[in-house]
Amino acid sequence: NENDTSPPDGILSLLQRTFARSFEVHPLVSQKLVQQKQQRLRLTNNQMRLLDYINNRRRAAISGGAGTGKTLLAVEKAKRLANDGFKTLLTCYNKQLGMHLESICKGIDNLEVKNFHYLCSSYIQKFKKEMNRDLLQEAKDSYGMQNQFDVLYPVALSYAADSSNFQFDAIVCDEGQDVKQSYWEPLELLLNDYDNGPLYVFFDDNQNIYSREKKFPITEEPFLLKDNCRNTSQIHNLAYKYYKGDWIDPPQNMGAKIMRIHADTLESQVKKINMEITNLITKEKVSPDSISVLLLNGEYKEIYYNIFEGLPLPKPAKLQIEWIQGVNDVLIDTVKRYKGLESEIVFLCGLDGSENGALDDLIYVGTSRAKSLLYLVGKERICNNILS
């Protein structure tokens, strides 16, 4: 047909092969993180119903595995008590967790947030200034030169209860399994109603990496959180291989598979981690503060830190070592110090020594810190052993 302007069959076939090839567009990692965050928010809102259920209880222990929302619920309970007019203390054992809780609760009336030992030291200083009493010296006079953190600080804190100005109407404790038995008495003494003052303890039986005896000043059976609302199911399934306790329902969000970076030396591990972090920030548009590097075994942490400090990150990202993570910070820390916290993406390294089962509790804690994406970094044999 002389009016037919379509290209000849040969040219048409060539055009189709060249321009009509099927291809697949993969969403950026940053986009996946946003989607998974929305899914977690819906699950966490369901967990909040527990707070309504225990609203009329003056004291309660709430138990749950990693990712069940214990810290979020502890913060929300403390905020509700403070908003209801209770002078409230939100406390924990871990220093890093304490700083995190303090930062997200800043400016809330009636709410004081401090980890246990910071609470002790600040009260010792405050009491000396306002009451002209040296509580630490009084503790030394009574108990001699015993361990400052395990004996003298708790004793000094109990002495502070002599003044009603230093007492609270209610106390909420997160990660209660890490609080030593000898710390509970001074905490209870800080309640202006020793017998009936509101006291809520959130804990995880399996995260007791400090090997504390778990006896809380609460007689009723604990309430159990059963839904994992932090991790993907891939991360959940790995972390809960190392969990001993009540069944926790895995999330429905499958998520990405566990990533592995194989390297035999510390230096090569760090270099490969740095390359992948650079890729996540530059190509996948991931915010630096969504990335954390955690050392399972902190024995060689200074070596890791020194190597990391010598490698560049794409600006404005910078490395933050053992401190609060800012908006442009890639954090590096140990699993023990990072306990109770979470990150969208976690690189878990320092895996040496994990094969004999001695670090199983730390593997549970370390892997479960990752919300969306988890990298295992180390010798191939060790990574395979953790995944097997």
Tell me what each language-model feature is:
Residues 40, 45, 51-128, 150, ...:
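Conserved helicase motor core of SF1/SF2 NTP-dependent helicases
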Residues 15-19, 23-24, 47, 207-208:
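N-proximal short alpha-helices
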Residues 141-169:
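Mid-core helix/loop region of P-loop NTP-binding domains shared across ATPases and GTPases
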Residues 1-19:
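Accessory nucleic-acid engagement/destabilization modules that flank
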Residues 18, 22, 127, 131, ...:
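Short, flexible helical or helix-coil boundary motifs
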